């Protein structure tokens, strides 16, 4: 007998519709006008390990300048709507606005390739856990030693119209702070912050807040022992809805472990007894298992350089295909292949002594960096239709404010008081409220500001990157000086031959 029964399958409803994010190519029209912009030579000099404060009558301190810092350039561009455009019919200011699109970039790096060392004169290392015949179970009060390392090798370039996002592990909060005892391991929390100029990169010890998570101040080299090391959050920037934080990125990382040590100090989490068989004599109590390697970036070579070569942006990884909103770019750069630290020596006497005495000389260390930025920008137009303006207002209302567009407030239904004698002492002060000052959204963040408002040129063939762009675009340059070939005038010549007369015999 056949029986009907309801299906056991669940009924799935379609997900609710979401607002669609469109690509900038859908509402931005690119023109055929290209401009070159470049900086002068950008130099910075400082101490590679820490900031030197003012002392000895010195009015200014020495900044911290390390190859293991991020260099974040905030590039300011001119307003294209106030730009002198040679073609007056290019756009209609009543119905259109102009924006810049970055189509080419070259990051020039000066100085020779080199390896710079970092270290700590009181580095926390107990035993050599790789080559020692046995590990000591004794825990001396102070086993720190003077150790230097060549850190992780990194080359990085991130370009976008907003700062790049970094991530690091910081000290979190406990759910039950009453149960936390002194000496317990703190909870960890993943924190996302903008990458600023001068922030430390991951040098091989991880991305974390060493100042709050390592209270010994001797677990890592001097340059990061009281700093926060950040790592770019590629996952979040790749998932950015509008794709403003990362048009594209270039990166190359290289690392291996040179030495293997363990840390001195009491082990916080003891090894469970069922994981080993108890020994005798010096092996009765296991030594510290808190292992830590010394990183090494190994050899640097010109064959693996990411800099001093042009890059062309045809299609960005996100929805923003190189459009520079707010007329600015953020360029995040890291290059540890030129990390040489200069050592300088000066004598404490008026003259250099004839016999060497180390007590009569002072040693200093400095690090220098050299940059040269070049860009190719394309002029673009945006037609201000209702849909486009509504979409831009949803994305970033400040863009419309920069274009002198604003939302009219609703009419007020309340009465407004209007006094007759405004200068009378019998009434309250009638001074107008001051206009609100436009606040910088990145106020308080540290960047290397680069102003290119007066460095744009349409003569691309006069600049190195411009000539490379014309070559890859297949545009032939017209000669401007020198003799020109004249067009030959057409002349008619007779090619007919006279026929010989036949003579009859």
From Swiss-Prot:
Residues 126-145, 480-505 are annotated as: Disordered. InterPro entries: Capsid_L1_Papillomavir, Capsid_L1_sf_Papillomavir, dsDNA_vir_gr_I_capsid. GO terms for cellular component: host cell nucleus; T=7 icosahedral viral capsid. It is found in: Virion; Host nucleus. Gene3D superfamilies: Major capsid L1 (late) superfamily, Papillomavirus (2.60.175.20). The keyword Disulfide bond applies. One of its GO terms (molecular function) is structural molecule activity. Self-assembles into homopentamers. The capsid has an icosahedral symmetry and consists of 72 capsomers, with each capsomer being a pentamer of L1. Interacts with the minor capsid protein L2; this interaction is necessary for viral genome encapsidation. Interacts with protein E2; this interaction enhances E2-dependent replication and transcription activation. HAMAP family: PPV_L1. Forms an icosahedral capsid with a T=7 symmetry and a 50 nm diameter. The capsid is composed of 72 pentamers linked to each other by disulfide bonds and associated with L2 proteins. Binds to heparan sulfate proteoglycans on cell surface of basal layer keratinocytes to provide initial virion attachment. This binding mediates a conformational change in the virus capsid that facilitates efficient infection. The virion enters the host cell via endocytosis. During virus trafficking, L1 protein dissociates from the viral DNA and the genomic DNA is released to the host nucleus. This is Major capsid protein L1. The gene is L1.
